[in-house]
């Protein structure tokens, strides 16, 4: 007989010999907190799928001033690029399963339409965005040394709309809304278990509002305060 761990469902089992009158019998035994490391991989994959393309208004910036290289003319563009590299490390409540994950996200977008009022202060922007995300997570059990690797690769397409009360002076209220449709391919590969593949897709939406108030200025620059709130549906 061997005391190697065996997997079934969400738990790891080990072969143990009975005691006393049952010493001639062998049993598969598990503890409530002795879960498979694949659980950590599934959780890491799901977190990546749900949050990779979640943004705030400040993540997308606004107009960017630049000087044309060939003509020297000053111009502006609404094109923006978001690049994110992220590392996470966590463990389950029992401390038996630990997970480390790395993620890379790239998003690009820009306005397709913009409107201003007669004073050119209030402004409404409408834009499109697209992105790619990749994540890799390694989970391992401190009980038996088993480990699991989870990976995700996905794309997103979305649209956003932003209203500013005073875009010129960058003060006052603002409201930002966006939705994003994403689709992912995910894998989970554990020790002595076949690789599991699955697909995920879904729609995520956000509504954000805030107010920017200038507090003052000095030789080093201007000082602002901006209370804000965001509600995300996923």
Show which residues each predicted segment covers.
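Low-complexity acidic/polar repeat-biased segments
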Residues: 6-34
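Intrinsically disordered, low-complexity segments enriched in small/polar residues
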Residues: 11, 24-25, 40, 64, ...
């Amino acid at each position: 007989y061997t005391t190697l761990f065996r997997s079934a469902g969400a738990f790891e089992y080990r072969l143990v010999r009975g005691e006393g009158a049952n010493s001639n019998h062998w049993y598969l035994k598990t503890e409530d907190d002795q879960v498979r490391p694949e659980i950590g991989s599934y959780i890491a994959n799901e977190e990546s799928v749900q949050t990779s393309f979640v943004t705030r208004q400040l993540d997308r910036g606004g107009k960017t001033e630049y000087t044309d290289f060939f003509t020297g003319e000053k111009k502006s563009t609404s094109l923006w690029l978001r690049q994110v590299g992220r590392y996470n490390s966590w463990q389950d409540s029992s401390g038996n399963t630990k997970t480390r994950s790395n993620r890379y996200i790239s998003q690009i977008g820009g306005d397709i339409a913009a409107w201003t009022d007669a004073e050119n202060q209030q402004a409404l922007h409408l834009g499109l965005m697209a992105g790619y995300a990749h994540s890799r997570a390694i989970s391992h059990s401190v009980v038996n040394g088993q480990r699991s690797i989870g990976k995700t690769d996905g794309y997103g397409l979305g649209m956003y709309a932003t209203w500013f009360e005073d875009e010129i002076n960058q003060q006052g209220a603002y409201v930002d809304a966006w939705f994003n449709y994403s689709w992912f391919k995910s894998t989970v590969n554990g020790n002595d278990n076949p690789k599991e593949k699955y697909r995920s897709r879904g729609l995520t939406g956000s509504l954000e509002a805030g107010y920017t108030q200038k507090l003052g200025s000095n030789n080093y620059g201007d000082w602002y305060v901006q209370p804000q709130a965001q509600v995300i549906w996923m």
